[in-house]
UniProtKB/Swiss-Prot annotation:
Enzyme class: transferase
GO molecular function terms attached to this record: deoxynucleoside-phosphate kinase activity, ATP as phosphate donor; kinase activity
The reaction(s) this protein catalyses: dGMP + ATP = dGDP + ADP; dTMP + ATP = dTDP + ADP
Presence of keyword Iron: no
Chain residue ranges for the region called Disordered: 97-118
EC number of this enzyme: 2.7.4.-
Functional summary from the UniProt entry: Nucleotide kinase that catalyzes the phosphorylation of dGMP and dTMP to dGDP and dTDP. A double mutation in this protein and the RecBCD inhibitor gp5.9 protein allow phage to overcome the retron Ec48 bacteriophage defense system. This protein alone when overexpressed in E.coli does not cause growth arrest; Y128C may be a silent mutation.
Assembly with partners or alone: Dodecamer.
Disulphide linkage map: none
Protein name: Nucleotide kinase gp1.7
Gene Ontology BP, a term: symbiont-mediated suppression of host innate immune response
InterPro entries referenced in this protein's UniProt entry, alphabetically: SaV-like
Amino acid sequence: MGLLDGEAWEKENPPVQATGCIACLEKDDRYPHTCNKGANDMTEREQEMIIKLIDNNEGRPDDLNGCGILCSNVPCHLCPANNDQKITLGEIRAMDPRKPHLNKPEVTPTDDQPSAETIEGVTKPSHYMLFDDIEAIEVIARSMTVEQFKGYCFGNILKYRLRAGKKSELAYLEKDLAKADFYKELFEKHKDKCYA
């Protein structure tokens, strides 16, 4: 696969749709879980064990897992850390049944339809309009070969995907992912304006 082969990269790194819990989307417990992950499916006894684990580990870091999690008064067969050595304290905290339930949509592998609503500032940011309805992207395209413009667009796609959600607000995640998708459209729209 070449550096600028967007289709192959897309297959290996499918875009994440911007809905659901940022911590779950990013698989990163440094973000707060907003999903109340798993709390709806637990028995009352399992909920009690989660509460004990959370209380036993108050003030300890979220990235602890396995035997690093203090589990006194929690039977081994009911301890999630015993059943899944990779589960972190942050993930256990996300299952806290004492947290209010947030009914946010979960991401599914088939959730690949573009949003019906446009996100303001993505497709026509006013600061990129130069004069007489000429956009900066047109000037950029006209100053490059098709391969250079392809690299410029794919570089921006990569930039927006890498930074998506890093500002830890869902609105920024959605906007960054929308910008990444928009650069694909920009390449198709303006590649004919490039010089040979």
